[in-house]
Structures are given as structure tokens and as C-alpha cells.
Regions:
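Non-globular targeting/processing and membrane-anchoring segments
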Residues: 1-129, 207-340
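Mature extracytoplasmic/lumenal regions of exported proteins
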Residues: 130-153, 157, 161-258, 262
Length: 340
């Protein structure tokens, strides 16, 4: 087993507002700015855990069955840095594959930051966590601004926070890149930048988290097939799709849609993922939870009359947590699709 990287792990705990006693960052945690950060995050996290994560942890083993125990790869396209929900639904995955258009950013180093800017950098970090803790998803437009701050920029600080708060210990962090064949090349050499984080979770075995900066539109994949080639080498996995902007409802995203339909042992999604019409009865077993109310106002053009009709004809078990764009549990719904 790989030894923990004390610097990366301490940085993750520091950014997550968790104790760093006995680490090189202990002195930094005596600053008022960090104490405020830790108290604010503790409070927000407690509410978030009670409202969302604790309920998912209770619901997922029974609802997902064998997929919950699956220790293969886990695909979460259009995820941004949302390791939180990936890990809550599928805690046993060997490899988490996340992606988004947001940059990875540099590896955070608290010791190189001026003590004058640290309080504002931590406040900005809390601000970028606001939407996922309040509404269960990142707002892409806001993230572009939040993640551009000069200190603690990119998705890595958020991934650190989520890993630390999920009770994981970071073993190693490496900036990577992919070439046209989907193979790893040194960071800066390939056209698809990413990060590879090896961590040990509560299950006490090494797991790997990848996050890649990439565009999943068909035209972008034609120009830059790197990420798709990498995924093909991972094989069959479990898939999560949540607050995916209904992008795969457009034929401009047919390649990623086709990949997930062909390579998923299970797909857990809200209605913003793959359109209902692709899950035909002869090929898929479908189970529904919650109440389907259609898209929120911003995405009304993506209504699915076939889904609405079929959902109205049968009742579904309630969903104890919110999921996707409908941020109240009583208005949320999800679908679990398993290939026959």
C-alpha cells in the first residue's frame, strides 16, 4: 500500500477545516481566518450531511443493490469536481472518473501563500462550495468565476475538501495529461490535462480519483479523442449523471451518450442525463424514485412527454433526499437503469 502523502493530506484537511495537529500546517491553523473557515464549514457540512449525505448512505445500498458494492470504475460525466455525490452513491468504486470544462489548477501549497491573503482565499473557497452544499450541484457559470481566484484556483482545492470531509486519506497527487491514444504523458505535454489522486477511504483500501478538463461535445471529441480513449481502456463501470444541463438530449453530444449506454452496468440519473427514449424496454430494466415534475423553468424545452406519461401511470417510492435541479426532496426524482 502506498504511504500517505503528508503534505497533500494535511493540505486537504486544512482546506476542509479539519484538525491538522502534528502536521507542518499546525501553525497555520492557529490563525483567526482558518478558525472562522473551520467553524463555518463544520456548520454547513453538518446541515448538508443530515439533509443529503446521511440519507444517501442509508438509501444507496438497498436501492442500488450489486452496483453499490461494485468495485470497478465509476463514470461521472459533466460532474465538475463533485466527488461528494460520486462517493456517496458508489463508495466502493476502484476508480472515479470525473470531468468538466473547469481547469484542474495547480497543486495547492498553503506554505507558499501569504498569510495576508489566506483568509480571503479560504472565504472564496467556501463561496465556491455554497451551491453544491445548498442545492446539490455546482453552477457552472459561477464556478468559472469562483475557481479563477489567484490563490487556491481550479478544481483541486474542492476535490481536496471533498476527499477530506469524506474521511479519506490522500496517498498521492499527480498532475497528468492524456495523449491522442488515451495514454498518460507528463503534465503539460498532452492536450487533455488532469489530476490523479490515490486515496484510502473508510474501506481501508487504495482507490483512485481522476479529474480531467475536457469538452464532451461531438466536435470536441473529434478534435481531441484523448479522454474518450482513456475511458475505453477502463471498461464497463457504474454511471452517475446529475444536473447535466440536458446536454445529451442534443445530438451534439451523441458520442458520450453512446459510450455510457454501451459501457454502463448501471446508470443512476435525473432527467437531465440521457433522454428516456434511449432506455427501451427490450434492453433496459428501469426503476424510478421520487416525483417527476419535469424540468425547471430554465430547461423547459427539454420536457419529455413519454417520461411524464409513463411516470404518471405508476407510483414510485419516495426519494428521501434532493437530486439534480429540483432541490427539494418532494420535487426530486431519479431513475436507475440496468441493462438486461
Amino acid at each position: 500500500m502506498q504511504a500517505a502523502d503528508p503534505t497533500a493530506d494535511a493540505t486537504a484537511k486544512f482546506l476542509a477545516g479539519l484538525p491538522v495537529n502534528g502536521t507542518p500546517l499546525e501553525n497555520y491553523s492557529s490563525a483567526t481566518g482558518w478558525k472562522t473557515h473551520a467553524a463555518d464549514l463544520d456548520r454547513a457540512w453538518k446541515q448538508f450531511d443530515e439533509r443529503q449525505l446521511a440519507k444517501i448512505r442509508e438509501w444507496a445500498p438497498q436501492a442500488l443493490g450489486p452496483a453499490y458494492q461494485d468495485n470497478g470504475p465509476m463514470y461521472y460525466m459533466f460532474s465538475g469536481p463533485d466527488f461528494l455525490y460520486a462517493n456517496a452513491f458508489f463508495p466502493n468504486a476502484s476508480t472515479y472518473i470525473l470531468c468538466g470544462t473547469e481547469p484542474v489548477g495547480p497543486i495547492p501549497d498553503i506554505t507558499k501563500m501569504s498569510q495576508h491573503v489566506l483568509p480571503s482565499a479560504l472565504a472564496n473557497l467556501r463561496k465556491s462550495l455554497d451551491s453544491v452544499l445548498s442545492w446539490s450541484f455546482f453552477i457552472t457559470k459561477n464556478m468559472k468565476v469562483d475557481l479563477r481566484q489567484q490563490q487556491l484556483s481550479g478544481t483541486l482545492p474542492l476535490l481536496y475538501v471533498f476527499l477530506a470531509r469524506a474521511g479519506c486519506t490522500i496517498d498521492s497527487v499527480e498532475l497528468v495529461a492524456l495523449d491522442k491514444t488515451g495514454a498518460f504523458v507528463p503534465a503539460g505535454k498532452g492536450t487533455t490535462p488532469g489530476v490523479k489522486i490515490v486515496f484510502t477511504g473508510p474501506a481501508a483500501r487504495p482507490q483512485t480519483l481522476y479529474y480531467f478538463t475536457t469538452d464532451l461535445a461531438d466536435w470536441a471529441i473529434n478534435v481531441n479523442p484523448n479522454f474518450g480513449k482513456f475511458c475505453e481502456q477502463q471498461g464497463q463501470g457504474v454511471t452517475l449523471l446529475k444536473a447535466a444541463s440536458y446536454l445529451m438530449h442534443s445530438d451534439n453530444f451523441s458520442k458520450v451518450r453512446g459510450y455510457l449506454l454501451a459501457h454502463s452496468k448501471v446508470i443512476l440519473q435525473d432527467d437531465s442525463g440521457i433522454p428516456y427514449r434511449f432506455f427501451t424496454n427490450d434492453k433496459w430494466d428501469l426503476r424510478f424514485y421520487g416525483k417527476y415534475l419535469g424540468p425547471i423553468n430554465r430547461f423547459l424545452k427539454n420536457k419529455q412527454p413519454d417520461l411524464e406519461k409513463d411516470r404518471a401511470a405508476s407510483s414510485s417510492p419516495p426519494l428521501p433526499f434532493s437530486f439534480g435541479y429540483q432541490w427539494q426532496p418532494s420535487r426530486s426524482s431519479l431513475m436507475i437503469a440496468t441493462p438486461k
